[in-house]
């Protein structure tokens, strides 16, 4: 029944065609045939299998190897909603920072950006005024070059600049601050350190950590000692994750060195292959052999 229904439907174009000119009235007998086909066990079983295959496919795409969802957010959620255009941008920015456990870092960076905009004579007025967009772009490029930003903060300014959302930058920064300020005032933070900290060391570290949070936040610190990190510390919380350990820094430096070395050897090999003495060029010397004069 199901096979016959499918062949008939496709051949006639009555049930699945998007063309109105080929549509013919469906008779009562044909309606009964369709209903019988849909109610047939084979049809229901096919639908069930298709649904399960779809669910399995989605599960594979949205879960990691351990079966844990990679799309389910484990980050923070603001307790207020701002529906204005600038508020929607602020929510998107908050979600991005939350998913990367960097709300604290982004909040601190963008507070600095907002301070620069507010206190630089004429900058806020220029961004919200009628001057040419190219001039506004130059201003924001100079601003970005004057501060160190994490990927989330940097992308926010990049997006707002090149989408010409100049008038929404300051309002979005204000709304983002409101979202951050709406968070729960109690925060549990796990600190991993290389050795058992003294009270003085704990006070210094906790003061540094607190600078990433709203002033009214109540803190609950817990410590874990891991000698393998050698020096420094690791912060873990729903608000911010930050690895400032010596061992991680060494790994990053080694990875960068390996990357540069691999690129160096690749350039040499290509030069030999193409019979070009690339090592004698100014570009090669500037890239690999120039001394860092700042260390002299």
Swiss-Prot record:
Keywords: ATP synthesis, Hydrogen ion transport, Ion transport, Membrane, Mitochondrion, Mitochondrion inner membrane, Transit peptide, Transport. The keyword Nucleus does not apply. GO terms for molecular function: proton-transporting ATP synthase activity, rotational mechanism. Coiled coil: none annotated. It holds the Pfam family OSCP. It is found in: Mitochondrion; Mitochondrion inner membrane. GO terms for biological process: proton motive force-driven mitochondrial ATP synthesis. The keyword RNA-binding does not apply. GO terms for cellular component: mitochondrial inner membrane; phagocytic vesicle. Signal peptide: none annotated. It comes from the Eukaryota. Belongs to the ATPase delta chain family. Component of the ATP synthase complex composed at least of ATP5F1A/subunit alpha, ATP5F1B/subunit beta, ATP5MC1/subunit c (homooctomer), MT-ATP6/subunit a, MT-ATP8/subunit 8, ATP5ME/subunit e, ATP5MF/subunit f, ATP5MG/subunit g, ATP5MK/subunit k, ATP5MJ/subunit j, ATP5F1C/subunit gamma, ATP5F1D/subunit delta, ATP5F1E/subunit epsilon, ATP5PF/subunit F6, ATP5PB/subunit b, ATP5PD/subunit d, ATP5PO/subunit OSCP. Subunit OSCP, of the mitochondrial membrane ATP synthase complex (F(1)F(0) ATP synthase or Complex V) that produces ATP from ADP in the presence of a proton gradient across the membrane which is generated by electron transport complexes of the respiratory chain. ATP synthase complex consist of a soluble F(1) head domain - the catalytic core - and a membrane F(1) domain - the membrane proton channel. These two domains are linked by a central stalk rotating inside the F(1) region and a stationary peripheral stalk. This is ATP synthase peripheral stalk subunit OSCP, mitochondrial. It comes from Dictyostelium discoideum.
